Amino acid sequence: MAEHLMSDVPFWQSKTLDEMSDAEWESLCDGCGQCCLHKLMDEDTDEIYFTNVACRQLNIKTCQCRNYERRFEFEPDCIKLTRENLPTFEWLPMTCAYRLLAEGKGLPAWHPLLTGSKAAMHGERISVRHIAVKESEVIDWQDHILNKPDWAQ
């Protein structure tokens, strides 16, 4: 009987991030697109500034990469989040499943693994579809910084 109960526990509750298969790891991504917004770094302080400028490969409406399998070929600066480098990505959003699970927390109620679709995530405005702009339409990237430093307010 105990074995049957174990199989009813979702993998993200029964495994550590290190124990997950590649498919399980990939499925944790809610597809919000926040990783696909460009970031700028202050050369003097190394502070990271978030913009609403979407990577050229991001389909803003669906918040999915147009060329996910070949993304590093098209975008050499694309981020590859792995089990090994996860601790170095302090900038991940507070809603990110990778971050939440690494911190011993659960998935949010709107997460696609719980709801079966991205609709709830989009409804909660977690995804970037309502703020992202196309890279090709941007003239001055600094005009698109979301977390401006005090001196630029």
From Swiss-Prot:
Lineage: superkingdom: Bacteria
InterPro entries named in the record: Puta_zinc/iron-chelating_dom, UCP006173
TM stretches of this protein: none
Family: Belongs to the UPF0260 family.
NCBIfam families, per database record: PRK05170.1-1, PRK05170.1-5, PRK05170.2-1, PRK05170.2-5
Protein name: UPF0260 protein YcgN
Species of provenance: Escherichia coli O6:H1 (strain CFT073 / ATCC 700928 / UPEC)
Organism placement in taxonomy: Bacteria, Pseudomonadati, Pseudomonadota, Gammaproteobacteria, Enterobacterales
